[in-house]
Amino acid sequence: MFSFYFNDNKITKLLMVGYGSTGKSVCDFLANFIDITVDISQNDDEFVNYDLNSYDLITVSPGIPLNKSPYRALTKFKDKIVSDIDIFYQYIKDTKAKTIAVTGSNGKSTVVTMTDFVLKDLGYKSILVGNIGTPALNKIGEKFDYCVVEVSSFQINLFNCVRFDLGCIINVSPDHLDRYQNFEQYKQSKLNLAKFSNDFFVYDVHNGIKYAGEYQIIRGAIYRNSTKLLDIVETKLFGEHNLENIIVVLNILDRLGLDINQAIDSIKKFKGLEHRCKIIKKVNGTTYINDSKGTNVGATIAALNSITNSKNIILLLGGVAKGGDFSLMIKSLDKYVKYVYIYGVDKEYIESYIKGYCKYQLCNNMKQAFELASQKANSNEIVLLSPACASFDEFSGYAQRGEVFQNLVAQLEQKS
């Protein structure tokens, strides 16, 4: 039986606030490894009935808004709050496994997935956990050389005692402003990862903080000093943003002391992520691209800037805006977008930013937006789903939204 100690005190009583996949992983772990009493608060009404002073530790789901009532009360008990990652770290800290944490507004999922892929392709045992979808505690019991962790700003806010071997921040742009007072507060929450990392670097092309090590991008290729390492056409990816992602991965591998030339061969095999700038197919001369994972303004700007050099995109935009600043995409809309179909719960909010800067139409839902876009699109044009929004007003998540888009493309092809 594993005994969890915190500040040299054995933990016997814990309150769990929220019970999603992360909360369930904590419960399952505690039931199997630790002799401890656990109370679970699954909603606002239950939460107010618990005496927070009576618990040794409190775990909080990353989805719980600490800036809103009644959960503001938790901010008085920060010393008691630990995350599932903290508990995971306590379990593995005496092993030889290396932990790598990556955060950022855009690109972090690609970076952690590519890093995990390369490590495995090089023959190491690697696990991929965190915000990418698999709770870390679900991997307890597995043997591994490396643990690659995608972390969100919400998760970092809950960290207490974890120490990553390497932390990195990439591409911070405005997001989740419904949970933060302003962009500076959101950015600082990301930078706090440094407090929990033994080694740390930032690669942020949006804010002028670009640590690239010995690497640089020249005309669609990555160079190390004056030696060309990789051209984008040698990979299964496209766009300068993916060259930037590759540079981050190379810096991670450099700091781990691994062979970069072997890593380049592995990177060439990496196929990218589902729902991230994926060409679905061409129907009646129109190319359909699924970028459902573009859940904020910065992600959609990156997609627009990487897909074409012409003003031939018909864009599907909308969902839950999360307080995003859509004025930031006006330059890219003007340069690359022929028409925008806006849908979702925050369509009027989005309209208020782009009105007068591009041609657009408001739609009832994504299906209607797709149908209208398909009717308007001509040969050699692109219908792009890159919503710049969360999906929870209409879908269970970005993956379901992307699957629905792909199904609509398949149905259109059958009718053609």
UniProtKB/Swiss-Prot annotation:
Matches recorded under Gene3D superfamilies: Mur ligase, C-terminal domain, Mur-like, catalytic domain
A single MF term (Gene Ontology): UDP-N-acetylmuramoylalanine-D-glutamate ligase activity
InterPro entries hit by this protein: Mur-like_cat_sf, Mur_ligase_C, Mur_ligase_C_dom_sf, Mur_ligase_cen, MurD
Subcellular location: Cytoplasm
Keywords from the UniProt entry: ATP-binding, Cell cycle, Cell division, Cell shape, Cell wall biogenesis/degradation, Cytoplasm, Ligase, Nucleotide-binding, Peptidoglycan synthesis
Domain of life the protein comes from: Bacteria
EC number(s) given by UniProt: 6.3.2.9
Pathway(s) the chain acts in: Cell wall biogenesis; peptidoglycan biosynthesis
Positions of ATP binding: 104-110
Any single biological process term in GO: cell division
Record flagged with keyword Ligase: yes
GO CC entries: cytoplasm
Main location: cytoplasm
NCBIfam families attached to this UniProt entry: murD (TIGR01087)
Protein's UniProt name: UDP-N-acetylmuramoylalanine--D-glutamate ligase
Species this chain originates from: Francisella tularensis subsp. mediasiatica (strain FSC147)
Lineage: Bacteria, Pseudomonadati, Pseudomonadota, Gammaproteobacteria, Thiotrichales
Gene that produces this protein: murD
